[in-house]
Amino acid sequence: LSLHDALPISYLVKSDPSLPSVLQNLWDHTLRHANLMIVICGSAMSFIEKELLGEKSPLYGRATGILKMLPMPYWDAAQFFPNYSSEDKALAYAILGGIPRYLEEFDPDETIDANVKRHILRRIAPLYSEVEFLLHEELRETAKYNSVIRAIALGATSLNEIATHTMMANATVSSYLANLMELGIVEREFPVTAKPKERAKGSRGLYQLSDNFFRFWYSFVFPYRSELERGDVEGVYERHIKPVLHDFAGKPFEGLCREWMWRESAAGRLPFRARAVGRWWDRQDEIDVMAVDNASDAAIVGECKFRNAPVDRSVLNLLRDRAARTGIGQRTYLLFSLGGFDQSLVDDAAASQSDVQLVGIDELFHE
């Protein structure tokens, strides 16, 4: 087994463009017949996929396997913080996502507040410059890409909204978005009930950042760089981050709940095995999480509340009203809550033949 980091190889190829041809000749005539496995790994995705293994590369077609590593699910990410409460585990995941490189930067014996200030906001912290490093490694015109990513982080989700926010032409923004999606920084989301033809047309698709840390960085580091460069870490955190951190974590919490539904479905603990799990929306309403069945007219619809207050019956009633607009007849309801549930909901869920299930924050992290 011969293991190599892609980044040094990329520098070698830039200094000597003939290197892939040399490797091709060596592989074709000698190494392919040896008891040897060569593994090239790293975050320089565009270099590996295009320059090293792409159609125009001498090494094209030589790879016997390509594995794109995905972020860890939240329950594995939580193992980095064994002493954290379930709430703090969810906050850490909302900030860092599931990339081990980011998760290991936080000290599990420090609070969320201390970790953010020490390991993200300080100029000497590796995570402070991580996003810029990745963009410079993969892209040109980073200033324009910064504008596009920042627009999405602030809530612009359609092509027109992003173009308006960045003051760029739609065609230009579309090109940048395509590159960001190829790198796994941005993803396009469709209602979970959308048919393949709808997805192909793309008219209802919404853009969002697929990486939690990118979303945090563009929400709280990028806009306050001048203060952070002057060393005002405490001020930036207390004024701009701490008061809204739970609101910021609301969207990642929805993603966490969707991951939970996938896990429960795979384990056979839902009313049916889900064909798809995602969000649902139309022009008027939105449902945070929804699982649909492949074989019947059934769905599980859910609402996610990351706030320190009990969820009451009004949330369930509103969810029922929204779910009626989906056109799916057989529905089960899930309520996810950081702050628990009021007694009327607990009684309702405990009743026989209830179509309501309550999932508290500790249950989400229960193995």
What role is predicted for each listed range?
Residues G205-E367:
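A cross-kingdom feature that marks ATP-driven nucleic-acid transaction machinery
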Residues L1-E234:
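Phosphate-binding site recognition
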